[in-house]
A protein has these predicted regions:
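Extended, highly charged clamp/arch subdomains and adjacent linkers
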Residues: 84
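Terminal amphipathic alpha-helical/low-complexity segments used for targeting or macromolecular assembly
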Residues: 1-58, 62-64, 77, 88-89, ...
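Extracellular repeat-rich scaffold modules on cell surfaces
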Residues: 67-73
Length: 326
């Protein structure tokens, strides 16, 4: 079945690719038959070759300002709407919806994924019912870590908005990410919530993970930027909020809460149970904080805890202990 033809009119389109100016000649698609919500005679977007848009299925480029070229592939029932650009080997299939977005450089988008007002670039795989919206940027790059072949992936029911996800990061499950910068091999999954704002993004990098029902939330004050680095993890029902930096071998789990700041945890730190850390606190070198333990630095004060130590039960610490008391 031939569902469209190419108009005879040629259109030249110029664009920048990695700093190089390129141009391509495009022809407009014209529907030949009625299918889905498209009627015969309807003009659509512009492509450089018939191989770009499949003659099978209900896939269609709806907007006359939308472009697809340079080895791109649009198949199945995929829809491309508004002024979108699909180029350079990008593969769009199944029931994907691309709306005012740019997809390029071998990105693969499948199943029921929605991309709105965002950029997807590089070798990555988006699948399931994932959503990328709100001016987000997904920039994949392999070969920057020991896992050279790992693809950046976003899948299941994950939602990303107003964020940048780059390199080889993995976002999946029912994770929700808003105003965040996630890079390297970081992972956010399960029902995790990563919530920044217009003032401050959340930063998750290296091999850090956020999962379970954990929440990582930025504040609106200056430097109220939660930062997860190296192998740090926030899990279960834990909450990390504000100016908190988690570094080597840190796990915050249970119903633990970190808030205020500046808080820094480094070198084999475990915070779990219903433990609470508030204010300007530095915790380092093999410390476990569990149970109902409460560590709080009041305004103008700072607490420094250095292990090895175990702080548990209902212990309450409001100042740096004298050596040997803990």
């Amino acid at each position: 079945m031939t569902k469209y033809r190419l108009n005879d009119e040629l259109r030249s389109f110029s664009y920048q690719d990695n700093g190089n100016k390129k141009s391509v000649l495009l022809r407009q698609i014209i529907a030949l038959i009625d299918f889905n919500d498209v009627t015969a005679g309807t003009p659509g977007g512009w492509i450089d070759d018939e191989s770009v848009l499949s003659q099978s299925g209900d896939c269609w480029i709806y907007d006359e300002n939308a472009l697809a070229f340079s080895g791109a592939s649009i198949t199945g029932n995929a829809r491309v709407t508004q002024a979108s650009v699909v180029r350079d080997g990008a593969q769009i299939g199944d029931a994907v919806w691309i709306d005012r977005a740019e997809i390029s450089h071998y990105a693969q988008i499948r199943d029921n994924v929605t991309i709105q007002n965002s950029v997807i670039r590089g070798e990555c795989l988006l699948r399931g019912n994932a959503r990328v919206v709100g001016g987000s940027e997904i920039i994949a790059a392999r070969g920057l870590t020991l896992e050279n072949d790992q693809l950046l992936q976003i899948y299941d029911r994950a939602t990303i908005s107003n964020s940048r996800v780059v390199h080889q990061a993995q976002i999946y499950g029912d994770a929700k990410i808003n105003y965040a910068f996630i890079e390297h091999r970081a992972e956010v999954f399960d029902f995790a919530l990563v919530e920044g704002n217009e003032e401050n993004n959340v930063w998750i990098c290296d091999c850090a993970k956020v999962y379970g029902h954990a929440r990582v939330i930025a504040g609106t004050d200056e430097d109220a930027i939660p930062t997860l680095r190296y192998s740090s993890q926030v899990a279960e029902h834990a909450v990390v909020e504000g100016n908190c930096v988690l570094k080597h071998h840190v796990l915050v789990g249970g119903h633990a809460t970190l808030s205020g700041g500046p808080i820094q945890l480094d070198d084999h730190i475990l915070v779990e149970g219903h433990a609470c850390v508030i204010g300007a606190v530095l915790i380092e070198n093999h410390i476990e904080i569990t149970g109902q333990a409460h560590i709080e630095a009041f305004d103008g004060d700072a607490i420094h805890l250095r292990g090895p130590k175990v702080i548990n039960g209902e212990q309450r610490i409001t100042r740096t202990p004298i050596a040997g008391l803990l």
